[in-house]
Amino acid sequence: MVLANRAKLQNSRSLVRVFGGLNETYACSEAEYSAGVNFSARDFPALSTRKPRRKLRELTGLNGMYHLNGLLTVCGKDLIYTPDADGANPVTCTEAVTDGKKALVGIGTKILIFPDKVAFDTADGSVSALGAVWQAEGQSVQFAPCDAAGKAYEVSGYGKEEPEKPADGQLFLKVEDEEHPWASTSTLEEYSASSGSWTAVPLEYCRITAAGAQKLFAQWDTVTVQGTAAQQAGMWTKLDGDLVVYDVLENGLRVRVSPEGDHVYGTLVQSAESAQWTSLDGKETRSFAVSTPVRMERRVPDLDYVTECDNRVWGCSSKENVIYACRLGDPTNWFSYRGIAADSYAVTVGSDGAFTGAATCMGYALFFKENTLHKLYGSKPSDFQLTS
């Protein structure tokens, strides 16, 4: 029997040395897979099957969960934290948040919860607000120019020429315009007997005496001040706005603000309906009517998705179409702009649609939209760059 010659089949073997993961596009290569079920990346770069499903615990009304030295679950309005340490008892905080879906992120020992803007501390099990608000309700607020130590001054006299025989430590207000002796053009001076000369005392700060404010704010916080009669009184034109707290005093705050106006050298006491300015020598007064109470706030933006990258919490707001970053290591300050590397950061994006997620990958903060990916580069606000 004679058989026809058959073409010999060549044997070949192809090795995949790099696993590319999931690729749902049309250009899926041999080192990738377009879809999969029951796979796991725990043995990366090798692809393995997942572990069998098992029941860990039963939860009702779950709105979010996050693991940081333990598992935090948000069930309805309650927070339940189960530490990883053996024998540690779970911590429950009832009525801590509103009932709704949450975005959570961890930094340090704290887990931040949005949109409620609260932080759960895994170290002591406490819940605290990220923002803070102080408002004058039935109490008066005092505004006075002060030095870098928070000290306010009183003078016994003023004029164009200093006294001929001053006492040691005597204060004198040297004026440039006698018709406006309390204006910012005048200079507060103090006499020193040891040197025999007068020294200028700069009053570049404002001491805000407001009972309870010292418990809500901390040093270097950025506080938004509203409702003051400072501009109306002719003391400061920029007291209303974002100010940096340079020091927390016994019963108030010390903020930096440039003195501008014809009545800088005086004290302003403001109540719910009126305000009164008194000169440094106590001899002149002026009264004003006010309609809004004094309000001080440490603001936190409304964020839809959050992630942590390089010791900052990053978040995005679909309402404003803005990406925010908190101050370095401080998730309570989101509007701190002092011109240093630890400043907060914000950038408006030009893409359409709402944000759909946020993540940190390979040291970069990523923000997702349906058809856009925004990527943040850089290590400090001065060199942050956004690519899309």
PLM regions and their residue ranges:
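Short hydrophobic/aromatic-rich beta-strand motifs
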Residues: 71-72, 109-113, 163-190, 218-226, ...
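Short loop/turn segments that connect beta-strands within the blades of beta-propeller domains
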Residues: 68, 75-77, 107-108, 114-116, ...
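Short, surface-exposed terminal/edge motifs of secreted or surface/virion proteins that either
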Residues: 81, 117-133, 170-202, 252-257, ...
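Small/polar beta-strand repeat architecture
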Residues: 4-8, 131, 183-221, 226-300
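Short, intrinsically disordered N-terminal pre-domain segments
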Residues: 1-38, 43
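Beta-propeller and closely related beta-pinwheel folds
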Residues: 49-59, 150-159, 297-388
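Repeated scaffold domains used in trafficking and secretory/extracellular systems
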Residues: 55-69, 94-108, 135-147, 298-308, ...
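Extracellular/surface-exposed low-complexity repeats and stalk/linker segments enriched in Gly/Pro
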Residues: 93-99, 139-171, 175, 201-204, ...
